[in-house]
Amino acid sequence: MEKFYVYKDSGVKWLGNIPQHWEVRKIKYVFTERSQKGFPKEPILCSTQKYGVIPQHMYENRVVVVNKGLEGLKLVRKGDFVISLRSFQGGIEYAYYQGIISAAYTILKLNDNCYSNYIKYLMKSFDFIQLLQTCVTGIREGQNINYTLLRKSSLPLPPLAEQRAIVSYLDSKVGQIDSYVAKQAQQIELLKELKQAVIANAVTKGMANYNNHHTKLKQSGISWIGEIPEHWEVKKLRHLINIISIKNHPNETLLSVVREQGVIVRDLETDDNHNYIPEDLSGYKLIKEGQFVINKMKAWQGSYAVSSYRGIVSPAYYTCDLRLAYKDFFNIAIRSRAYIPFFTQYSKGIRVGQWDLSPIGLKEIPFFLPPLSEQRAIVSYIEAKTASINKLIDAYEQQVERVKEYKQRLISDAVTGKMNVTDEQTQTN
């Protein structure tokens, strides 16, 4: 990394020293705030940390339906920058489309003599995000960036030609890094697929194919399951679970069910779920360690698990006592990909994404039950087999995190003048 020959004190705490020929300019002189309303026919936009500001229909996760008040939404033009309610976490977003967006957001038009792609990198850099966090007001869900404070802060501005050179350098380097990360992510997904295959096979075939076991098999009668060990029982969940509902424990720990992790302690400080939580939690259901919890609206996605915690969950969840099955085997089996199609099959609804699993449907789901000793043996086998896979996954994920941290540092160093991009490009060429 080549440094500039001459630096100066920027006079700005978050910047420190910058190249002598760079300018420092207050944000209020870099942007003009835009607050135009009354464009109800424009497409509704949403601000995302991953994709920038894009049409709402293109966003793959939640969609907030706006039925009225379109006149009150703010106009965003292509090339604007948008401060959303979550910008303090991931930077200010660039608008790739024209449309309208929440009136709670701040819309900024970039002034002349600034290259938008340079500002894009700057707005998403680690050092700038640290600055944003000093301008946050409110607590928890009410946190927001105070633009009155932020506009008084300053940004580093190299000459326009140098802004373009920095962007060219970063586009090349970031492209290489992103390509590497994508390849590593593919390897991680392959390992996760292998892990799921190992689990699904073990909880439906038992030890028949391992350690020279020669177990007779029989047809399960389920197309995607195929054969199961002949000595296993097939029981509907009505024989394995007992739905209960104990309330009036508002002071217990608030829990939630996440598809990938199972039952977790809900962290209200970082919760990005945006689900409404009432002040009075007396209607929430008590769940104890070892009980089975199902999010009835998302069961078809795999949002259910045996809990390792005591706490309370939403009234929209089913809470169940377990019987007959070893809880660790039941948890591993029921959360495997072998069983998710059953929950999809018994969930009903008019629109995809709003399917509801009824108590009757839940109790009709079949479960393939080995003898208790075999359940324990299968759990031990799965734990041993998946431990080695998890170790590989962890190694890949740690490598990806290191590369992502390098990417963030590279961007921050380039846009704040800590490295001479012009010299870097000359050496590369």
Walk through the language-model features, giving the residues of each.
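A short glycine-rich beta-alpha junction/loop motif
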Residues: 8-10, 85-86, 99-106, 139-164, ...
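Ligand-binding loop in jelly-roll beta-barrel domains
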Residues: 110-115, 322-327
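Short, ligand-facing micro-motifs at secondary-structure edges
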Residues: 40-62, 81-106, 117-121, 130-136, ...
